[in-house]
Amino acid sequence: MKNEMWSGRFSGASDELLKEFNASLNVDKTLFNEDIQGSIAHATMLESCGILKKEELDAIVKGLEQVRSEIEQGKFIFDIKDEDIHMAIEKRLSEIIGSEIGGRLHTARSRNDQVATDFKLFVKKSHIELIKLLKELIQTMLEHAKVHKKTIMPSFTHLQHAQPVSFSFYILAYAFMLMRDVKRLQNSLELAGFSPLGSCACAGTSYATNRELSAKILGFKDIMPNAMDGVSDRDFVLDLLYDIAVIFTHTSRLCEEMILFSSSEFSFITISDSFSTGSSIMPQKKNPDVCELIRGKTGRVYGNLISLLTIMKALPLAYNKDMQEDKEGLFDSVKTAKDSLIILNVMLKEIRINKENMLNACKKGHLLATDLADYLVREKNIPFRKAHFIVGNVVAQAEVQGIDISEIKDLSKIDPIFDEKAMELLNFEFSLNSKQSEGSSSIASVEKQIQILQEFIKKL
């Protein structure tokens, strides 16, 4: 039996295996709202161009709103035989208002531009949702930054002790990463602002339509100027997948450090019991599962990006069925990102900063060595490389004594070039605030950085 909406050209029915293999309804039904939104805009445009009558438009809009209500209330029956969400909605619409009017909705439109429009609307909405979540996470980081300007901790390079910084300075580094993530999403949202609706299969339509009107109704800033590009383009999906992948690069780095810093070896932070789990055999265990899962999910969102890049890499123009595989990975990445950002934000709100442990850790690894070298250059006019060698000898002597250079009582006993003033440098807070360059760890600089971020999120 031939009951597919495209079956007029065929003399026989599709094999049941093909129907099941070909169908995307279980995935793309996520787009029901966008599909109805796009159809209402398309029908409105058709009526304005005299292609639909006013009473036909009214019936279509009323019918589509009923379909939306049925889906939202769980009353809509999804049938795999309908193939995709577009056909499922159109079939139900025709059942409600009759095929004579319902069948007119698809005038001057193809599923090719229809799905591209639906998907782009979903992507645009996802950008906005992710920007909001990133804003909230930045705000949480800013709250920590405001409180911990004088909470001193070691910074690391190569995971070795480097220089003293504040926890404020540390967490602001991640806040600025997230600021770039927001800007990246904003740029991608700008690029996604062109409507493919009305491109039809690939070459446009012989009807005198008004693509600018439907684009305006749907909130696009303009139309895609080439119909073939309109239905072939999935850059907007790749952009969002890439943006999410970079977000996870940043959150994964943060989570890795939260895992390290909450371990017994560091004990810089304590993660709330609400966001930790135990062991089935070891009673003492408190595991940072949230951080580990976000770190693990990073591979998942990377995979979704690589998957679509591979799908698109050699596709001829215009639409190909391969592109049906573009949605599942995107839906997964968006949900994964939203879920992860929400729980990471709440977890960060509740972490406890162990100030004393952070400060004690600064007394290992000779964090003040660079300050001593800079002092020799600045006060004794010694070339930096020579100063580097002199301070390296101080470090070696301290290690022989089994102490950190911050614990040395008299530097002049190691090298007479050091005077009493040099001893003032052996202070972590002094080191922190001695930095004068823009973007440094000093309290004055940290306050400027906080202001930059506050002004940025105010505009979101």
Curated annotation (Swiss-Prot):
It holds the Pfam family Lyase_1. Pathway: Amino-acid biosynthesis; L-arginine biosynthesis; L-arginine from L-ornithine and carbamoyl phosphate: step 3/3. Gene3D superfamilies: Fumarase/aspartase (C-terminal domain) (1.10.40.30), Fumarase/aspartase (Central domain) (1.20.200.10), Fumarase/aspartase (N-terminal domain) (1.10.275.10). One of its GO terms (molecular function) is argininosuccinate lyase activity. Keywords: Amino-acid biosynthesis, Arginine biosynthesis, Cytoplasm, Lyase. The keyword Cytoplasm applies. This is Argininosuccinate lyase.
